[in-house]
Amino acid sequence: MKCPKCNSTHSRVVDSRHADEANAIRRRRECENCGTRFTTFEHIEVSPLIVVKKDGTREQFLREKILNGLVRSCEKRPVRYQQLEDITNKVEWQLRDEGQTEISSREIGEHVMNLLMHVDQVSYVRFASVYKEFKDVDQLLESMQGILSDNKRSDK
């Protein structure tokens, strides 16, 4: 690792620990040349996921897009940012566990909605209204009826 201060390639590891639910290693290093301490992260190299969008175009999977959508859906709601990070991590690992290299944006949305429904139902409806592109209020109400019937079943 190059020192960010003097560009020396000679450093020693001072501390090492797991990060990101053991999917990465955080290392604290000290430059042997100038004594500067800096942090590096070692991540598992995973093959890229390709998202097939509704119009058929393909783009690289970006977890930040999921997180940004969740943040917008949960604005002014009692949802902690860490919960949104957890949902994003779970969705990404579910997709990678499926072993596919290409995944449709529809499948990603379904994964997100399944997890978000259990965190905050208002945020779920907000997310679903954008994701499912409701054409009118009737479609929105139909989606909400599904939530209400699920709640009644789980209350019994």
Swiss-Prot record:
Pfam families attached to this UniProt entry: ATP-cone, Zn_ribbon_NrdR
Record-level GO BP terms: negative regulation of DNA-templated transcription
UniProt key word Plastid: no
Entry protein name: Transcriptional repressor NrdR
Family: Belongs to the NrdR family.
HAMAP family in the record: NrdR
Species the sequence originates in: Staphylococcus epidermidis (strain ATCC 35984 / DSM 28319 / BCRC 17069 / CCUG 31568 / BM 3577 / RP62A)
Zinc finger (unnamed): 3-34
Keywords, comma-separated and alphabetical: ATP-binding, DNA-binding, Metal-binding, Nucleotide-binding, Repressor, Transcription, Transcription regulation, Zinc, Zinc-finger
Ranges where the ATP-cone domain occurs: 49-139
